[in-house]
Design a protein with these regions (language model features):
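Stable alpha-helical elements in mature extracytoplasmic
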Residues: 33-37, 43, 69, 86, ...
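A short, structured surface patch at a secondary-structure boundary
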Residues: 25-88, 99, 183-186
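Alpha-helical, coiled-coil/dimerization segments enriched in small aliphatic residues
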Residues: 49-60, 166-199
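Extracytoplasmic substrate-binding proteins
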Residues: 20-26, 90-166, 187-189, 194-195
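Residue-level recognition of alpha-helix boundary/capping or hinge positions
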Residues: 17-22, 73
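Sec-dependent N-terminal signal peptides
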Residues: 4-14
Length: 200
C-alpha cells in the first residue's frame, strides 16, 4: 500500500530526474508542476526563469508567480510563458506585451495530466519523450489500480497554503486518485461553491 501511494504522490507532483540537453526555445515557467514536467522530459535547458517554488538544481532566475507582471517578464525575452493561474492579470498583460503564453490550469483528472504532458512535449520539441512518458504512466497506473484493495478505507486530505486551509474533492487530481483507488474521500460531501475541487 505504501509503495502504491508513493507512486501516486509522485504522479501528483509529476516529478522526475533531470538531465542535460540544449534547446533553442526560451521558456519562463510560472508553475511548479510544469517546471517538473519540463525536467522530466529532459528539457530543463529551455528554462530561463521559474516560479519561486519550483525545485531545480541548476542556476535559473526565480520569479514570484503571484505578483509578477508581464512588463517585468518582457526584458527576459521569452519565447513562451507557461501559466497555471491568472494571478495579477498576467494573461491580459502577456497579450498586451505580445508575449506567447499557454494557460494550463491544475489538472483535475488523469486525462488532464496526460494532455498537459503532451502539450509541454510539443512546446519543448520532445513529443516522442512525452508520448513515452504518458504511455508508461498509463501502464503503471493501471497496474496499481488492478492491484488496489482499499475496501472500507476513508481519507481526509488537507492542503495548507499561506492564504488558507483547503481539502480536495473528486473534482481535483488528488481526489480523482482516491476515487480510482476506491478510497472514500469525506471531503466529497463538502460544499464547493466555485467547483474548484478544493473546498475550504
Amino acid at each position: 500500500m505504501k509503495t502504491k501511494l508513493i507512486f501516486l504522490a509522485l504522479l501528483v507532483s509529476m516529478c522526475s530526474s533531470p538531465a542535460q540537453e540544449s534547446e533553442d526555445i526560451k521558456i519562463i515557467s510560472l508553475s511548479t508542476t510544469h517546471t517538473e514536467i519540463i525536467q522530466s522530459l529532459e528539457a530543463q535547458d529551455t528554462l530561463i526563469a521559474v516560479d519561486a517554488f519550483s525545485e531545480v538544481d541548476f542556476p535559473v532566475e526565480r520569479i514570484d508567480a503571484y505578483t509578477v507582471t508581464a512588463e517585468e517578464l518582457a526584458p527576459l525575452n521569452p519565447d513562451m510563458v507557461i501559466v497555471a493561474f491568472d494571478f495579477n492579470g498576467i494573461v491580459e498583460g502577456l497579450e498586451s506585451q505580445e508575449i506567447n503564453y499557454v494557460l494550463l490550469p491544475p489538472a483535475k483528472n488523469f486525462e488532464d495530466v496526460y494532455s498537459q504532458i503532451s502539450t509541454i512535449g510539443e512546446i519543448v520539441n520532445k513529443k516522442g519523450a512525452a508520448s513515452s512518458k504518458v504511455r508508461d504512466m498509463k501502464l503503471e497506473i493501471n497496474r496499481i489500480l488492478d492491484d488496489a484493495n482499499y475496501e472500507n478505507v476513508s481519507v481526509y486530505h488537507e492542503i495548507g497554503y499561506s492564504y488558507g486551509i483547503y481539502s480536495v474533492n473528486s473534482d481535483s487530481l488528488i481526489g480523482e486518485i482516491y476515487n480510482a483507488l476506491g478510497i472514500v474521500n469525506i471531503a466529497n460531501s463538502e460544499e464547493d461553491p466555485f467547483g474548484s475541487g478544493y473546498p475550504a
